Structure formats: structure tokens, C-alpha cells
């Protein structure tokens, strides 16, 4: 066989083998090889408008324990409008990733942002403390849900700028339910907002009531042994929260405020760094802020926290609803004409949230259709126009669900 032909045959045979080897799945990263049993929290700022974004690290903080799984370091899905990834700097190997949402991501879709008004928002991100230097990368989804890098920085765990302070001893900790090791359970934490120094017993009772509401519904009811529940109490100078439309402003621990994005019933916190600092007194995976007020309302930032008032008759239902956003990454299944979001779910793009879909083959199909019962899909039934806040066709689950009501 001529040498040229031999070389060609070698390439034809070898290249597919090389490509197959390169495409072979890599073993999951070993926690003990790359991380220590602590957490590293990155407190950052996002600033910009609808067309621009700047990410700045404010500080890095060591937390005393990594409470999450040691095996699910790279999840099979990336919920959220952002994803952050941690690469081992020496080998460039991906060793950790998480999807997340931010208050800034919601702001970018509002009319002020579209008009060019620049605002700054806080966000805290957390991952296991690495043993060696890592590359910290943040990626953002575009309107077609494709990810693009927006920030990267080398982080050295030996950096003396990393804060290693102890949690405040003045905060009171309540543990109504401990089912096991934080590394093996979901650690649910309630935080006090708008409770005066003399309201500690009321906060305890509110935590017990909300815990009962949570484990009174599925899927939490059947999985309650998978959860630890703790609460952290820090007194506020005044009771309640800010209500800007009523010209009412209160000095509180976490700065909760209604009228987020100019929506009267939408309550959020802009003190995300402080919220995570307060939560770090205990192991935490899921955060819920309880606001000492009889007013109806609440809010959430997906994959970060939820917040609700406690003394309205519907407060337990609002809490479970908002938890569906923050913990489950679910979309709203209703439409309000007063919403300030523009093109939050662009037409023709499949939403990231698992409970809504834009798939055209679901349109017009009845849940009673025999073919519907066997059709592969994420949702369990088609709903009305307007699911997920946007004003165009999006299929959604059935009417009587917590994320709708």
C-alpha cells in the first residue's frame, strides 16, 4: 500500500476513535480532591440597564460548612437566567456549576431599564471552598436561551482578603425540625424581618405555623424527613416593612419593601448580601424571609429566596406559592395586567421553568384527549394565554395548583 494511502487510511480510522475518546463522559469531580468542608460566598453587584451589564465582586466570605451534597457538584440541568461555573485553574476542569436568577435579571425587562436607566443590585453566590485556585465564571442567557460569559476571575482560597469572621452571637437560633446531617438533608431556614426585640416568641410561633403549612402539602408532606428546618431571629428597630406607595418606611433588619419594580403587591429585599450573612449562622440551602405584617403579599427571586408577610389569612398559601419560585424554580401560572415586565418570555423560545412550555404541539389539545395522556411533556395540561407573566401563548398545568393561586 502506498505511503500516502496508508496515512489516509490511518486518519480515517483514527480520527473517529480520537473523537469518541474525547467525547467520552468524564467521571464526576471528587469533592475531597477539589474542595474542603466549608463554603465560599461571593457577594457581588450587578449594574446596568436592558442593554448593558457589569458584574463586580464586592467581597468574598468563608462560611463554616458546605451543607449541600458532595456528589451533585455539576447538576444535569441549568435552571435560571444565569449559570456560574467553577474550573480548577491548573487543569481547566469543570468542578462545580449552578444556575441562578437575580433581581437585576427581572429589572432588565422593565420599562425604566429599556429606557436606559442604570441600577445596581446585590447577589450572593456560594460554592464549596476550593483547595487550590479556581476560575470563577458567570454566564448569562440571551433571548434565545444561549449562554454567554459576562464575568470571570481567578479566585485563590489562600487570599487574605477573604473574610473569615464568625456569625453574630447576638442572633437567636431556633431549630423546630432536625432530621439529619446537613450534608444529607435539605436545610430550610426562616429569617426574621420587621420583628421588634420583644417579638421573638411571635416569630417562633410564625415559624411553626409556616412549617406546618409547608409540610401539609405535597410534595413536602411525603418528603418531610428529607428536610431540616431552622430559623434565625435578628430584631428590627421597627415592625413591618417599607410601603413606598403609602409613604411608609420602616427601619428593619433586611430592608424588605413592597412596590418592587413598581408593583404594589410585589415585595422583595435589595439587601441580598446581608440576608446571606444572617443565614450563615446556620447551615442553609433554602431561604424564606418572614415579614411581621398583616398585609397581603410577598415575592421571590428564583433559586435564591422567598419572602412573605405572616399575619394575613392567606399568608401560608402565599408562602408555599413563593417557595415554588425560589426553591423549585417554577414560573407563575397567571397573568396580571399591571406587570411591569416586557418580553420576559420571548415568543417562540422554550421557557427554562419546568412547569410551563411554549411547545406548539400542545396548543389546542384538551387534557381529556386520550393522546394527551401519553404525550411526552413537562406540563400536565394546557392553560390560558398569559402563563409566566408574558402575554402570548404558553401552555401551563391545570388551574388548581399552588403556583397559580
Task: Show the residue positions of the predicted features.
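Fold-level signature of zinc-dependent metallopeptidase catalytic domains
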Residues: 160-221, 231-241, 260
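Short pre-active-site segment immediately N-terminal to the catalytic Zn-binding motif
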Residues: 202, 299-322
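N-terminal prosegments of processed precursors
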Residues: 23-122, 353
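Active-site-proximal segments of metallohydrolase catalytic domains
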Residues: 229-302
Amino acid at each position: 500500500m502506498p505511503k500516502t494511502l496508508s496515512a489516509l487510511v490511518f486518519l480515517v480510522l483514527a480520527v473517529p476513535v480520537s473523537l469518541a475518546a474525547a467525547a467520552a463522559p468524564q467521571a464526576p469531580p471528587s469533592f475531597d480532591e477539589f474542595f474542603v468542608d466549608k463554603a465560599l460566598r461571593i457577594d457581588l453587584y450587578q449594574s446596568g440597564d436592558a442593554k448593558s451589564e457589569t458584574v463586580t465582586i464586592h467581597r468574598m466570605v468563608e462560611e463554616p460548612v458546605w451543607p449541600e451534597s458532595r456528589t451533585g457538584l455539576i447538576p444535569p440541568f441549568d435552571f435560571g437566567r444565569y449559570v456560574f461555573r467553577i474550573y480548577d485553574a491548573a487543569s481547566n476542569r469543570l468542578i462545580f456549576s449552578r444556575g441562578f436568577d437575580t433581581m437585576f435579571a427581572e429589572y432588565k425587562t422593565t420599562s425604566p431599564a429599556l429606557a436606559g436607566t442604570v441600577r445596581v443590585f446585590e447577589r450572593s453566590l456560594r460554592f464549596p471552598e476550593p483547595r487550590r485556585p479556581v476560575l470563577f465564571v458567570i454566564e448569562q442567557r440571551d433571548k434565545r436561551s444561549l449562554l454567554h460569559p459576562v464575568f470571570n476571575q481567578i479566585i485563590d482560597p489562600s487570599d487574605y482578603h477573604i473574610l473569615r469572621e464568625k456569625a453574630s452571637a447576638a442572633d437567636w437560633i431556633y431549630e423546630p425540625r432536625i432530621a439529619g446531617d446537613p450534608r444529607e438533608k435539605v436545610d430550610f431556614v426562616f429569617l426574621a424581618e420587621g420583628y421588634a426585640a420583644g417579638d421573638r416568641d411571635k416569630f417562633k410561633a410564625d415559624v411553626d405555623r409556616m412549617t406546618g403549612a409547608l409540610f401539609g402539602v405535597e410534595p413536602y408532606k411525603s418528603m418531610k424527613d428529607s428536610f431540616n428546618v431552622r430559623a434565625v431571629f435578628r430584631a428590627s428597630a421597627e415592625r413591618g416593612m417599607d410601603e413606598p406607595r403609602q409613604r411608609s418606611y420602616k427601619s428593619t433588619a433586611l430592608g424588605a419593601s413592597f412596590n418592587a419594580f413598581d408593583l404594589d403587591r410585589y415585595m422583595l429585599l435589595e439587601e441580598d448580601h446581608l440576608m446571606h450573612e444572617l443565614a450563615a449562622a446556620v447551615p442553609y440551602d433554602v431561604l424564606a424571609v418572614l415579614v411581621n405584617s398583616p398585609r397581603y403579599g410577598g415575592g421571590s427571586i428564583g433559586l435564591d429566596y422567598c419572602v412573605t408577610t405572616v399575619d394575613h389569612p392567606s399568608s401560608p398559601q402565599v408562602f408555599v406559592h413563593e417557595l415554588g419560585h425560589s426553591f423549585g424554580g417554577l414560573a407563575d401560572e397567571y397573568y396580571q395586567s399591571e406587570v411591569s415586565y416586557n418580553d420576559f418570555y420571548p415568543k417562540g423560545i422554550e421557557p427554562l421553568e419546568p412547569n410551563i412550555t411554549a411547545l406548539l404541539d400542545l396548543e389546542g389539545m384538551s387534557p381529556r384527549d386520550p393522546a394527551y395522556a401519553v404525550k411526552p411533556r413537562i406540563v400536565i395540561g394546557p392553560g390560558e394565554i398569559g402563563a409566566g407573566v408574558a402575554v402570548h401563548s404558553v401552555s401551563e398545568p391545570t388551574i388548581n395548583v399552588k403556583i397559580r393561586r
